[in-house]
Amino acid sequence: MADLKVGSTTGGSVIWHQGNFPLNPAGDDVLYKSFKIYSEYNKPQATDNDFVSKANGGTKSQGFQKEVEFREGVKISATFSGGSDLNGLYSGNGDGASREKANMDLRSWYGIGIWNTCTGDGSGTHNSGLMPGVVHVETCWRLLFQTDNVISNASGPTGPAHLTRKDYVDGAINTVTANANSRVLRSGDTMTGNLTAPNFFSQNPASQPSHVPRFDQIVIKDSVQDFGYY
């Protein structure tokens, strides 16, 4: 029998023994040299391996630091009873022949809210909005803008259903024409011509020589006046 000693080899490799065996127990772990061996019992953790955890999520430095591609969309499951499991962001199929197939879909079980953290006059650095070339909004009830202003940067309206801009409305109602110049305002204007109307109603009786008298202040032509006996 061969005499085994430190440095003995077999097949050209050093024989492992208690002094050079690379596996060592460390509590419930097993180390290879100084490195932990993962097992079914001791599984790798997200913090140990630059993972984003399914259970714990990941934000800031623990979140994704580079672009992430999702081939079939991002599904956001409802966390309440009655919500749809189709919530999420999904890509279209690239078929430009039909809008519903080509568009990217932002899906919601009921509605989509756009929220920001602006304060004061709303001119902070947090902005929200839809900014493609065309925004088509369909609603069966109403479209509510709960903000100080709704701003349109486009030109003036061209159709009856178009939303108008303030400068367009101001220009339309403040335009001075020959007809507008011939009208009398509600107060403060003096006419230079005759005023003809079927009847004039005066709330107050005449009290100055230049006032037009009311019917109860005059004597009707050809009427009989009874002044009584003196």
From Swiss-Prot:
Record has Zinc-finger as a keyword: no
Main location: virion
Protein origin, superkingdom: Viruses
Cited Pfam families: Phage_T4_gp36
Compartments it resides in: Virion
Subunit text: The distal half-fiber contains two molecules each of Gp36 and Gp37 and one molecule of Gp35.
Name of the protein in question: Tail fiber protein p36
Organism placement in taxonomy: Viruses, Duplodnaviria, Heunggongvirae, Uroviricota, Caudoviricetes
